[in-house]
Amino acid sequence: MGATTSTTGTSRGGRGARERILRAAKELFYTRGIHATGVAALIEAAHVSPRTFYVHFPTKNALVEEYLRRFESQTPIAAEAELGRDDLPPAQRLLAIFAPVEGEPTALFRGCPFHNAVIEGAGELPEIARLAERHKQAFRDRLVATAAEAGAADPAALGRQLAVIFEGANALAASCNDAQVFTDARRAAKTLLDVALGSAPGG
C-alpha cells in the first residue's frame, strides 16, 4: 500500500464525506499506525471539517471499528484470497498462503491490520479485540476446512498449526521488516503438510 494521503474530492462535507474519512483511515491507520494517526491528520486527509468528522464518527475508536469492518469486507487479506482459489488443489492452497509478499524492496511490511489494532489497543479496546478475534477465528476455520478437503487425518490440528506458523510469520516479518520470513514459514508448513497428508519428502 502506498503512503499517499490524498483523496478524491475537495468538498468538506456532503454525501461523500464518510467514504473519504474511511479511505483516509484505511491509508493512515495501516501505514502510520492507529495511535500515531491523530484526528487532525484524518480530517486533513479526508478534506472534511471537524464537525463533519464527528457527525459520522463520534469517537476515534468508532472509526477504528468501522475501518476494520471495512477492511474485512472489502480488502481480503492476500492469504484469504489464496484459500479461495479454484485453480489449485487444497494442499497447494494451504501452501499458497505463505507466498512471499510482493512490493517495493524498501517498503515497510505492515502485517495484519487486525493484529496491529489489537497490539496498539493493549487490551483497552475490547470491541476492536472482539473484531480481531472473530476475524482470526474465521481464518482458522477456513484453514481447518481446507485441511479437511486435502484429506488430513486431523484437519482441526493441522489447521490450527498452520495458523500458528502463518500468524508467527506475519508478526516476525512486521517486527523485522523482513518479508523473507515467509520463505522459511512455507518450508515449515510444507514439512507439516507432508507429515499430515502422508506425502513423500521433497514432493
Predicted regions and their residues:
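Short coil/turn segments at alpha/beta junctions that flank glycine-rich nucleotide-binding fingerprints
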Residues: 31-35, 108, 150
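N-terminal intrinsically disordered/low-complexity leader segments
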Residues: 1-16, 197-203
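Short, basic, alpha-helical segments at the C-terminal edge of helix-turn-helix-like DNA-binding modules
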Residues: 69-75
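Amphipathic alpha-helical packing segments from all-alpha helical-bundle domains
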Residues: 76, 82, 92-96, 124-149, ...
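Hydrophobic alpha-helical connector segments
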Residues: 66, 80-109, 155, 159-162
